[in-house]
Structure formats: C-alpha cells, structure tokens
Amino acid sequence: KETAAAKFERQHMDPAPAAAXXQNYCNQMM
C-alpha cells in the first residue's frame, strides 16, 4: 500500500483530473 507521501507525489505528477484532486488534497494539508 502507498504511503501518504508517495500518493501525494504521484498525484502531483499525474495530469488532470488527478491534478484537481491533488489540489483539494493540498489545500486540506495546508
């Protein structure tokens, strides 16, 4: 299973729509 950090990195390297989800995830983390 992926760690949160690995998932975070992968999402940021993916094209949309994953990018949109990553943005949401980022905002929650900040």
From Swiss-Prot:
Q: Which InterPro entries match?
A: RNaseA-like_dom_sf (IPR036816)
Q: Where is the composition biased (Basic and acidic residues)?
A: 1-13
Please name the source species.
Odocoileus virginianus virginianus (Virginia white-tailed deer)
Enzyme class comes to lyase
Q: How does it assemble?
A: Monomer. Interacts with and forms tight 1:1 complexes with RNH1. Dimerization of two such complexes may occur. Interaction with RNH1 inhibits this protein.
Keywords tagged on the record = Endonuclease, Hydrolase, Lyase, Nuclease, Secreted
List its EC numbers: 4.6.1.18
* Summary of the tissues where the protein is detected: Pancreas.
**Which compartments is it annotated to reside in?**
Secreted
Residues annotated as catalytic:
H12 (proton acceptor)
Chain positions covered by the region annotation Disordered: 1-21
State the reactions this protein catalyses. Answer: an [RNA] containing cytidine + H2O = an [RNA]-3'-cytidine-3'-phosphate + a 5'-hydroxy-ribonucleotide-3'-[RNA]; an [RNA] containing uridine + H2O = an [RNA]-3'-uridine-3'-phosphate + a 5'-hydroxy-ribonucleotide-3'-[RNA]
Main location class:
secreted
Q: GO terms for CC?
A: extracellular region
The UniProt similarity line reads: Belongs to the pancreatic ribonuclease family.
Give a short account of what the protein does. Answer: Endonuclease that catalyzes the cleavage of RNA on the 3' side of pyrimidine nucleotides. Acts on single-stranded and double-stranded RNA.
Name used for this protein in its record: Ribonuclease pancreatic
**Residue positions binding substrate:** K7, R10
| Gene3D superfamilies noted in UniProt | Ribonuclease A-like domain (3.10.130.10)
GO MF term (any one): ribonuclease A activity
Which superkingdom heads the taxonomic lineage of this protein's source?
Eukaryota
